[in-house]
Amino acid sequence: MIKYCENCGSALTEKLLPTEDRLRLVCDECGHIAYVNPRIVSGTLPVANGRVWLLRRGIEPRMGYWTYPAGYQEIDETTVDAAIRETLEETGLRVAVSRLFGIYSRAGSHVVNVVYLARHVDESATPSLSREALEILSFGPDEVPWDDLAFPSTELVLQDWVSLVRGPEATP
């Protein structure tokens, strides 16, 4: 939870303002309202030949668990730019976005996930490990490591991918 004002450094207090319908963190000194809102995480499902590339996380949180390449969007990026950059940083794969795959959010979560379907720019390229990836493998719809996925959002995204590939009745 945020404790101090980003404008003046004074302590924040929870208040119900006349213009708001919920408690907000307000600075008693300068009146700044500190909104606590989710951040955008952009990622791709790099797909080739009916298989999706996933990485085993090399960093916390959830180090050692599988996810698709993704990360926080920087202020000077679009969601597409961030998704492409994160995929290159984490897997070494140069991708082109095919289309928006989905937007995933949950109440109480600090992130909104924006996920794109992507294809390799160079289909002969192979992924390379990074400080964020312990392992990078491609999985078919019947091979997804469901018990070892990093986040609830990872599971939702991959369930939707399996439904796209196999049809809705095939979702695990």
Name every feature range the model reports, one short phrase each:
Residues 2-44:
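Acidic, metal-coordinating catalytic segment for phosphate/diphosphate chemistry
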Residues 29, 57, 70, 118, ...:
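Active-site donor-binding loop signature of nucleotide-sugar glycosyltransferases
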Residues 36, 62, 107-110:
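Short glycine/serine/proline-enriched coil/turn segments at secondary-structure junctions
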Residues 40, 61, 132:
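A short beta-loop-beta micro-motif enriched in histidine and acidic residues
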Residues 43, 51, 135:
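Conserved beta-strand and immediately adjacent loop positions that scaffold enzyme active sites
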Residues 46-47, 54, 118, 138:
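Conserved hydrophobic "DFG−1" position in protein kinase catalytic cores
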Residues 47-89:
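Conserved Nudix-box catalytic region and its N-terminal flanking loop in Nudix hydrolases
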Residues 73-96, 100-160, 164-172:
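Unchanged
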